[in-house]
Amino acid sequence: MKTFLGLCLLVYADMILVPALAQAATNTTSNDAPAHETKATIEGLVRDIACPIQNLEATATHLSMKCLRACAKAGSPLVIPTMDGELYVPISDKMPDTDQRRKLMPFLGKYVRASGTVYARKGTHAIAINNIEELKGVRLNIEDQ
């Protein structure tokens, strides 16, 4: 099971770099389809990517700060999972893409509202964040500090 979950993480990491990869094997449509782009605001928990992918018990409001800090320190990409189960990867609005970790690190383990340009392509979601703020009224289930 751990091998399978590890493989899932590797596949998702590839999806960050090549968004169409996840459906390429099962989808016969062109991988060159343009991404859908819109201005939007999302709300979710800033966390590392490993836990929501590998831990099937993970939710948008439940986390271990000890694990989160260790994964972030080790370089795990940061993402924003929402209450409805969507996972948003932060990207730059310019090419080449620049590191968005600096923008998210102050919000690690916090529930946020992020506004910007949202991109969707074949089930993968990304956001070029223009504005981000912590939402204080969300009850988080934090296992440890």
Q: Where are each of the predicted segments found?
A:
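Bacterial N-terminal signal peptides
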Residues: K2, G6-A20
